[in-house]
């Protein structure tokens, strides 16, 4: 994500997230190394949230969510909508809970599809970032 120009990485504890604690100091070292390798002079900030509800309450970014129930592909969404997303919610390996999906819908967050294959969370994030970057680079 650092090499793709992300300004902020948010780690959200989801209902179906694994038990492991996010190691922010370790991730900061990785981000700094990746930034230096790709020639970035600024480093993305890292933020941890205890729940999706906290993230949605404290985050004012234009947000979309990636889920298999999405009724349109990311590329179609980008082409047909004027909203330029600045935040993408990627579910955990265990998927969003019913409550989290309901919360996303209640907040009118568009749910998009990343394709027909089930992707690992890390892969889904890179895929979404790459697709959004590619779309806006080619648009200009």
Outline where the language-model segments fall.
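RNA substrate-binding interface of SAM-dependent RNA methyltransferases
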Residues: 2-64
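Structured adenosyl-cofactor binding patch, chiefly the S-adenosyl-L-methionine
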Residues: 98-140
């Amino acid at each position: 994500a650092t090499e793709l120009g992300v300004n902020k990485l948010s780690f959200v504890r989801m209902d179906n997230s694994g038990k492991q604690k996010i190691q922010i100091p370790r991730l900061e070292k990785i981000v700094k190394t990746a930034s230096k390798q790709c020639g970035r002079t600024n480093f993305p900030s890292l933020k941890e949230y205890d729940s999706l509800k906290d993230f949605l309450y404290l985050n004012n970014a234009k947000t979309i969510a990636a889920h298999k129930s999405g009724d349109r592909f990311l590329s179609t969404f980008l082409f047909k909508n004027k909203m330029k997303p600045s935040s993408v919610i990627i579910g955990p390996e265990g998927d969003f809970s019913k409550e989290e999906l309901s919360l996303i819908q209640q907040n009118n967050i568009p749910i998009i599809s990343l394709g027909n294959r089930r992707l690992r969370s890390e892969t889904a994030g890179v895929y979404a970032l790459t697709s959004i970057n590619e779309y806006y680079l080619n648009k200009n």
